[in-house]
Amino acid sequence: MAEFPFEISPMFEGERVRKEGMFVELGGPKSLGLELVRAADMDAIEDDKVTIVGPDLKDMEEGKTYPWAMIFNIGGELVEPDLESVVERRVHDFINYCQGIMHLNQRYDVWMRVSKDTAGKMDSFEPFGKAVMMLFKTELPFIEKMQVTFYTGKEEVEKQMELAKEIFKARDARTKDLHDEDVDVFYGCTLCQSFAPTNVCVVSPDRISLCGAINWFDGRAAAKVDPEGPQFEIAKGDLLDAVTGEYTGVNEIAKKLSSGEFDKIKLHSFFDSPHTSCGCFEVVGFYIPEVDGIGWVDREYQGMAPNGIGFSTMAGQTGGGKQIVGFLGIGVNYFYSPKFIQADGGWNRVVWLPSGLKAKIDEAIPADLKDKIATENDATDIASLKDFLEAKNHPVVATWAAAEEEEEEEEEEEEVAVAAAPMMMPAAGFQMPAMPMMSGGSGGGIKLTFKNAKITIDKLVISEKKEKK
């Protein structure tokens, strides 16, 4: 558009600004990043006003990372506090319409980059702010007036961050007494499909969006004021499984929105047809087979999990709108859900959390498990994690003995089967070839153990090996 120094179009959604093409980075994993929308009286808003508190774009050094906070105030006859988070989530959309400006995540995890090319066309964030507000008022006509303040100084961003977290906490508390069985409809969101085309985000009273920004009430408000927008109703349909959270309506929308890639989503399952994961999730869960437990790591944690992998690597494996068995992206508020991964043990399956995340969700953790869940201060690898869980008698430890007994029973069954094999009568005319003894050295042979494996063999050919003369 001519009045702005950069092009604006939905075609730029999904555009990535790589490090080598970046002028500055705002927020992200190395700093603080925040976005917040607040409803206000019309008289308190100066329409289209952009205020910059701290260094402006022209004052920033190329290649550096700066703290960043965006506070939008909106007003209008139909504007109410229930719409704040709905409008807030569209920030992701509209910023990504701006060429050369990348926006990821939400709330207190915002990560932005401005490309060198775009920075070369403007020396201030003001035209960027005006462009985003223009898009908001064009796409969401119930917004009659809007203003924005950008904060780029660390002290002020930290102050705004603390205020915002209290607001987010109050929003999330609204669904505490409402559950999946109490409503007839859930809500879907397709905001992340520009980055994760097959992602199907289902928001229910007991499961907040992966990004943590949209709860059931937010979805309802969004679908009401913007019926053609990215949030929409999902008819629950019939309940197929109350434990896993499987509904016919959710399965139908999963198949439709993923273009047939998935035909079912179980809202409260970690392993069996789990919810898809986009890339905006706040936390990623990962299965640790050595202890038969599940660990969780959030964006704020910069270290390695006991499996030797950090958040960014696991996020790359998990995201993209896929169902990756063994990994699961969630919003932080899902930890507070009474249906939290209930199909796979719930909190009794959780074995590791970063200390910062553990402190943040302290109220969600059952009292009898708080000292049994390890952090990076207790376990940094699988061996130390196993020792910790054993010492604390974590619930998963009981499954280890059961697994060992099962393995022993399987070995006994195998031995019986081998002993009985010579007694089996072959079909007439068929001579079983002599089978050579497999040896693994002094250890007494080779042992193969398959657990929970599904093996399909179309054809098995056993033939005698003839030596060359």
UniProtKB/Swiss-Prot annotation:
Binds 1 [Ni-Fe-S] cluster. One of its GO terms (molecular function) is nickel cation binding. It catalyses: Co(I)-[corrinoid Fe-S protein] + acetyl-CoA + H(+) = methyl-Co(III)-[corrinoid Fe-S protein] + CO + CoA. InterPro entries: ACS_CODH_B_C (IPR045822), CO_DH/Ac-CoA_synth_bsu (IPR004461), CO_DH/Ac-CoA_synth_bsu_3_sf (IPR038571), CO_DH/Ac-CoA_synth_bsu_arc (IPR023432), Prismane-like_sf (IPR011254). [Ni-Fe-S] cluster binds at C189, C192, C278, C280. Pfam families: ACS_CODH_B_C, CdhC. Pathway: One-carbon metabolism; methanogenesis from acetate. One of its GO terms (biological process) is methanogenesis, from acetate. Keywords: Acyltransferase, Iron, Iron-sulfur, Metal-binding, Methanogenesis, Nickel, Transferase. Its cofactor is [Ni-Fe-S] cluster. PANTHER family: ACETYL-COA DECARBONYLASE_SYNTHASE COMPLEX SUBUNIT BETA 1 (PTHR42281:SF1), PTHR42281. Monomer. The ACDS complex is made up of alpha, epsilon, beta, gamma and delta chains with a probable stoichiometry of (alpha(2)epsilon(2))(4)-beta(8)-(gamma(1)delta(1))(8) (Potential). Belongs to the CdhC family. Part of a complex that catalyzes the reversible cleavage of acetyl-CoA, allowing growth on acetate as sole source of carbon and energy. The alpha-epsilon complex generates CO from CO(2), while the beta subunit (this protein) combines the CO with CoA and a methyl group to form acetyl-CoA. The methyl group, which is incorporated into acetyl-CoA, is transferred to the beta subunit by a corrinoid iron-sulfur protein (the gamma-delta complex). This is Acetyl-CoA decarbonylase/synthase complex subunit beta 1.
